[in-house]
Amino acid sequence: MAFFVPLHPNIKTMQKVIGIGETILDIIFKDERPRVGEYDSGLQPIGAVPGGSVFNGVISLGRTGINAAFISETGNDRVGRKIIQFLEDNHVDANSINVYPESKSPISLAFLNEKNDAEYIFYKDHPHDRLDFVFPEIQADDIVMFGSYYAVNPVIRQQVQGFLEYAQEHGAILYYDVNFRASHQNEVVKLNANILENLEYADIVRGSKEDFEVLFNKHDAETVYKAQVSFYCKNFIYTQGSEPIEVRGAGGFSRQYPVAPMSTVSTIGAGDNFNAGFVYGLIKKGITREMLVTGLAPELWDALVGEASAFSANVCGSIHNSVDEAFANQKKRELEVCLKEKEENI
């Protein structure tokens, strides 16, 4: 069994974050990069960074001082070793990473368009995916982040579902980022049961406008919430790029949050770090599962969406998939002050 040593040993009440998802090496290209010389193909990458939907958010949380761990799989190669080292360098427990000696670690090619939105091509060589891991220690109000195709993949569904049930039984807060790509649209019917189960496990569901158009052919937050989400989960976040964020919550909460204009270098990690900022806010504000069930006060929702938006904006300013060091250090200091004040008031 993997145990987690708190990064702040003097603060005994800090919630842990456990992410479960894919690991991948993102090789990033800029479609509009000017060619230099007659023989320049215009295809030279502008960067290569470890990534994965939940992975990116967990890295940001590790950088901000959150006690974080990650469950995933890699191949036994240079890419896999780089990914594990990257987790450890960013203070994320990597003890639950499966290394398969017969497999190659996955990579993706990400092509940024003129708006710096990414189009992906994925390459994966895991012929026998099985996700064999020992469940980490989970206590009440720890936070589990899951999502993307990894959370509905039939090949590893039994293991993922078993972990989600274990986390739920132990009182964890489950945060589900739907993140369902159009490339899997032909599998929607086959995966529908897994998607609905995930909605039922979740205490918080976040998805983008594109996710729900692909999954349910529905085009606005209110319709998605009432028709597809609210029966399973009352706390719902609907993002739509530069358009306002829509939030629905237990107790009838409903609010729209404008997205501040920003110049972007890459939007690859925008949604992933929105998730990270929201989870950071849950810990900073001491949100419990019981509070989510009964309904959060409007000012708490405001604070959570504010943190989520700040994390997302920061990561859009570079080609990296997680928040930068200066931002992370600032958030780490804020968290330490906040948790210390709470400890003194106990």
Predicted regions and their residues:
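Conserved phosphate-binding/catalytic region of the ribokinase-like
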Residues: P6-I18, A221-I346
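Short, conserved phosphate/pyrophosphate- and ester-handling motifs at nucleotide-, phospho-/glycolipid
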Residues: L61, S208, G271
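Conserved beta-alpha-beta core of the PfkB/ribokinase-like small-molecule kinase fold
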Residues: V152-K226, E243-P244
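Active-site metal-binding loops of divalent metal-dependent hydrolases
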Residues: T23, S53, Y149, V178, ...
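A short, aliphatic-rich alpha-helical micro-motif
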Residues: E137-Q139, N198-L199, S230
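Glycine-rich phosphate/adenosyl-contacting loop at the front of the ribokinase-like
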Residues: F3-V92, K342-I346
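Conserved N-terminal subdomain of the carbohydrate kinase-like
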Residues: N67-S148, R333-I346
